[in-house]
Amino acid sequence: MRKIKKNKILITGCAGFIGFHCSAAFLKNKKFLVIGIDNINNYYDQNLKLNRLKILKKDNNFTFVKIDMNEEKKIYKLFEENKF
């Protein structure tokens, strides 16, 4: 059986409202590997964000990286390790 190559995508703010729903939609499609990043800040309820991440992490095609977009070295490393 031929293995289908999945496209890898990056979703920023994956624990927020829009990022969570975008991540869930790509995962539902089954054709994508989703790398979600978020800094889990306290702009609003962090427990809500953590619960969203629990849902996303149930899918083996999802990987979470706790990172802030201002962490330049970590962002560069993420892009060095992944082809998006």
Predicted regions, residues:
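N-terminal Rossmann-like NAD(P)+-binding domain of SDR-like oxidoreductases, especially those catalyzing
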Residues: 1-84
